[in-house]
Every structure is written in structure tokens, then in C-alpha cells.
């Protein structure tokens, strides 16, 4: 088909649910063809770095979390969530260029989210906090379900705005009509 492949739109993408990333854990997650090292520090802060150590390219997800940093499995260089090298065990000083590439991250509404823009531009909007899902005002645990769809992001978005097709094509019960408000990149319905 001439429509494929679609470009990946820019915006915030879910890397994992917050409860899936325990303190001291590292996961390799691929976003838009790029491998990322997603980790939670010992104090509980989520962070995301390019998965490959800037020293010699070792996969950081195969390392371990030490305090507030991830330690490379090859030479034990350590990088914090801001990409700063915090330790080189055999060096007296850390070179200025020893910096891991970071990805903008937000942890909100029970999800660890990363920003993607094909031209590397910084985020131009924050994700809204949903009342009742965060911190002190959290009133209930969410239920989670993973669904794998053999499709692309654009088709998911197109289907979301074509509510009528669910009833006629997929033979699902009709959705109740709701008011939809679009405020910049945010859709509320």
C-alpha cells in the first residue's frame, strides 16, 4: 500500500506503567526504533537514557542501578537520570564529554512517558494530571490490560475519531455520545 509506512508522530509515548518499574530496576524499551534504558533509582525516581553507553556502546540495560545512577556493565561508568557521569572507578576526574543522552520524561497518571520528536525538538506541552490518579489524591488502583494490535499509531488515532465504525464494522455496542473538546494537543471526551 502506498500509505505505508506512516511517520511516527511527535508527542508523549508510554514506555511502561509505573508499577512495572521497581526501584533499582532497568528495562530496555524501544521507542521509534531507538533503544532506551528506562530505570528507577533507589530513591524511586524514573529516568530514561539512550541505551548505549557513550564510552564504548555497552547496553546500559544490562548494567545495574547504583543509588541514583545506572552503572554500565563493561567498565562500570555510572550515569544519573540527567545523563551526567557520576563515577568512573579507575579515573581521577570525569571527562566533560562523558555524558549519556537523555530523553524528556514525565511520570504521570500511573505511566512512565517519554517524548519523541523526529527532529529532536523539546516538548512543547506537559501531560495533564488526571484527578484521582496521582500522589496524595490517588483514590484507587487502575486495572491494566495489554492489547497487541497489528497496526500503526496513525490508524489507532484515525479509529479513535471514527466512533461509528466500532458499531458497524466491529459489531461492538454503540458508544454513548459525549462532548469532545480539543485543546491544542489534548483531546478530552
Where are these regions (language model features)?
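Beta-loop-alpha module in the N-terminal Rossmann-like domain of NAD(P)-dependent dehydrogenases
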Residues: 42, 59-62
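Short Cys/His-rich local motifs and their 1-3 flanking residues in nucleic-acid-associated proteins
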Residues: 55-58, 77
